[in-house]
């Protein structure tokens, strides 16, 4: 489904990703963990073509982008990759002047050129799927953060992607709203959708992911099954990270 080989990404002299090589199989859930500044979000942006790779190659659902490709071919392949991927960001990025339903169907009308009645029917089904059918005519300003993020998930699903990418989808939410978004993602996992999730929700990653990828300083430090990673991380860097996360969780529980 996703094949990455020797991926590097630099912003000027700053090398953010360094020789990343990994695979994501169809129907699997991969959680990417790591401290802030480790390159996790940049990796997702490169997969989705929102950031141009500096070196290496990325293949998504049989479509490949690589460093020595002609500009014309790369632009075409990036466009095709975006059609195969849905992305949900930390910020919801909903159109404030459009209702929940209008946000969901916007791309169906403008990109897929779908008939409005068909798009509305699909949009309503997607809002039902995330428990927001009754909010279809509500504007984002009247929705909670968790509800807005669920609308954003519906919007990404509307394009029928082969893989969903989540960039810390709960980081902007109040603690009491986190579970409603995680529950939607968990349902997608149960349905067998391919998911790549950057997250700081350790318990969620432990319960839902098929594989953990731990990044630090722009490289993949460690990867493995959740039960192995959380019980006995192989590297000192991963052990230190998990201890810090456990300490943070304990402090939050005291508040």
Regions found by a protein language model. Name each.
Residues 48:
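Helix-to-loop junction immediately C-terminal to a conserved catalytic motif
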Residues 56-67:
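Conserved ABC transporter NBD signature motif
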Residues 65-86, 117, 232-233:
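ABC ATPase NBD coupling module
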Residues 138-141, 159, 191:
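Conserved signature/switch motifs of ABC ATPase nucleotide-binding domains
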Residues 164-167:
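Catalytic Walker B motif of ABC-type/P-loop ATPase nucleotide-binding domains
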Residues 223-224:
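ABC ATPase "signature
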